[in-house]
Amino acid sequence: MVMAHFVENFWGEKNNGFDVLYHNMKHGQISTKELADFVRERATIEEAYSRSMTKLAKSASNYSQLGTFAPVWDVFKTSTEKLANCHLDLVRKLQELIKEVQKYGEEQVKSHKKTKEEVAGTLEAVQAIQNITQALQKSKENYNAKCVEQERLKKEGATPREIEKAAVKSKKATDTYKLYVEKYALTKADFEQKMTETAQKFQDIEETHLIHIKEIIGSLSNAIKEIHLQIGQVHEEFINNMANTTIESLIQKFAESKGTGKERPGLIEFEECDPASAVEGIKPRKRKTFALPGIIKKEKDAESVECPDADSLNIPDVDEEGFSIKPEANQNDTKENHFYSSSDSDSEDEEPKRYRIEIKPVHPNNVHHTMASLDELKVSIGNITLSPAVSRHSPVQMNRNSSNEELTKSKPSSLPTEKGTNDLLAWDPLFGSSLESSSAPLTSSSSARPTTPLSLGTIVPPPRPASRPKLTSGKLSGINEIPRPFSPPITSNTSPPPTAPLARAESSSSISSSASLSAANTPTVGVSRGPSPVSLGNQDTLPVAIALTESVNAYFKGADPTKCIVKITGDVTISFPSGIIKVFTSNPSPAVLCFRVKNISRLEQILPNSQLVFSDPSQCDSNTKDFWMNMQAVTVYLKKLSEQNPAASYYNVDVLKYQVSSNGIQSTPLNLATYWKCSASTTDLRVDYKYNPEAMVAPSVLSNIQVVVPVDGGVTNMQSLPPAIWNAEQMKAFWKLSGISEKSDSGGSGSLRAKFDLSEGPSKPATLAVQFLSEGNTLSGVDIELVGTGYRLSLVKKRFATGRYLADC
């Protein structure tokens, strides 16, 4: 079978083959990016599966270790861990493959740019033959018309003068027609030669591209095949282990580990009663009046057997009158063990002390007081929220914690001030002044959650002073006030430390985080927001949405691309549903929201919201960066927003801003060039625009395009193509285009033309402004994903739009 070549199949009457082949080459970049996205998605799935298997393996360790089946859980755990490692190895291989695809994509872009320069001559030849074809067709029609006119005059018997004029016109049309035929022949030869070479070049590029893509796919399939072979080996090993785990071996292990001994009870013979022994055996039992309740039952069970010694029955020492003797112990031991503790006497010959015990009955007058106390106790218990069991501390540890608490109270702490060195654009009031914290004591009983950035303990703000001096309006400078969150009462004998000066009124840094409570012990909260009620539980994954918004600012100077100035910035906003606020407030330690920013190689600078977002500056990955949020600060901020707008169904929080590295005019999605021709009576204007898909990660449609051009000089009339609107009050011409993409006419290239009649000319060339936007895409290629559990990403919205997009002549 003979392969169909590009040289043979891309000609046609309209000579559009070059355009089709060129765009096919550009689609190769899209296929490369989509292949990288596919492999990345597969790696994400494998990573999630590996984590789930690891979690399952850990849960197998928590299953019951009692019974004969217990050793089987070790087999399950080992097999599951190996399966998790297999999938984790596949993730590593896929990540290496993604880097290879991205590297190939970068080389592909460079190759396509070089090819574009090489085939520029072919593009000119295509345009030339299209123009000469149109001119030839018109000259042919003119020639036929003149010939027909001459023949008509001859047949109608026109005057010789008219016939002579018609003959002159016919001869002139004939010469023009022949001239265009000759030009067409020369242009056709040049076009065929260049088009043949270019078509072959495009075919070579496509063959190389497909070969490389197939090699990448082969590497992908081999990696998956190797992992599946390893998984098969793990399953075989599991089958063999289960085959070796016989019922006999399980029963034998249980008997060896849990066996109680091989000696069976001996025979007991009847013995005659010895009165002396019987009296001594009865005497200790009469002295058990104040012994422990559990011991009495043991002695009743043992009465059918010979009386064992006192030590084996754990009977306390009694005096001659039958009272239990309280063992001697120091104060700490007494507090630790209460009356259950026993201490050995230094001398067995020492005479024990005697204690007289007196039980006082309840006085009748205290009955009502007792009932009232019981009622108060029931009310108190009803208001208590159960928390997870807290491990007991020894008195030494409690004393140490108390010392630390007193030391912390004496030394107020403050968070370091962090400011961005370079501001991108005007920051939101949320990013106002630097974060400063007031002094706050650390509670000794609370501990920070392991997953939160708070490592010392619960930060409790001091109580609000009776009178707070108000800051001047100049210091606030448009910064929205964030209220101080609710502070738990401080149970301390010492007075609270004074409030440190704040950079802002009610600084959001004074945020309290309560002690770590398990989410499992917190009741589910039913939340209703608007027409669609949402039931959110603390164990459910909470939905959040993320918006990536980028702004491209550009200044074009004439038609010189080297004078173009470009600046691209971006914002990341997280949207929380209104129902999540009750979940946060009902759980003192909500799950930390962590997110990862990917594809950051093109970013020059990232500025997180220092009051709400933390990051690790030591991260070494140049293409990703992880962030996590201060959940207490987020809760306070969301509560503030809900108070300002209670009816809102969701609340937006700006988390970070970034700046994208630009490459001049190549980073602008719409290239501009303006031309002015000004005279005393008229002004001619032309604006050339060109769609630039190379500025975007994936070419997308530019919509809502608006062009505004101010023209002075007293405009009396305007003629424009395409039609524009003239605003006489503002002295501006206004164009509005529906959309531009690479599928538009001429690949998204075009011109705006206008002619203005003036009464007070000449005009002065002015700066024009352009606006447009694009949904579902970004210029930087930045992407975001959630890391960890507790939250799910319900929506990711991407868009970019113009900021200050200006052009001068």
Swiss-Prot record:
Tissue-level expression: Ubiquitously expressed (at protein level).
Coiled-coil ranges from the UniProt annotation: 87-156
Region (Disordered): 301-352, 390-422, 435-536
Cross-link (Glycyl lysine isopeptide (Lys-Gly) (interchain with G-Cter in SUMO2)): 297
One Pfam family in the UniProt entry: muHD
Taxonomic superkingdom: Eukaryota
Composition-biased stretches (Polar residues): 390-416
Biased composition (Low complexity): 435-456, 501-520
Record PTM Phosphothreonine, positions in chain: 385
Membrane topology, as annotated: Peripheral membrane protein
Region (Mediates dimerization and binding to membranes enriched in Pi(4,5)-P2 and induces their tubulation): 3-274
MF term (GO), any: phosphatidylinositol binding
Gene Ontology biological process: clathrin coat assembly; clathrin-dependent endocytosis; membrane invagination; protein localization to plasma membrane; synaptic vesicle endocytosis
Domain F-BAR intervals: 3-250
Role summary: Functions in an early step of clathrin-mediated endocytosis. Has both a membrane binding/bending activity and the ability to recruit proteins essential to the formation of functional clathrin-coated pits. Has a lipid-binding activity with a preference for membranes enriched in phosphatidylserine and phosphoinositides (Pi(4,5) biphosphate) like the plasma membrane. Its membrane-bending activity might be important for the subsequent action of clathrin and adaptors in the formation of clathrin-coated vesicles.
PANTHER family for this protein: F-BAR DOMAIN ONLY PROTEIN 2, PROLINE-SERINE-THREONINE PHOSPHATASE INTERACTING PROTEIN 1
Record's protein name: F-BAR domain only protein 2
Naturally occurring in which organism (per UniProt): Rattus norvegicus
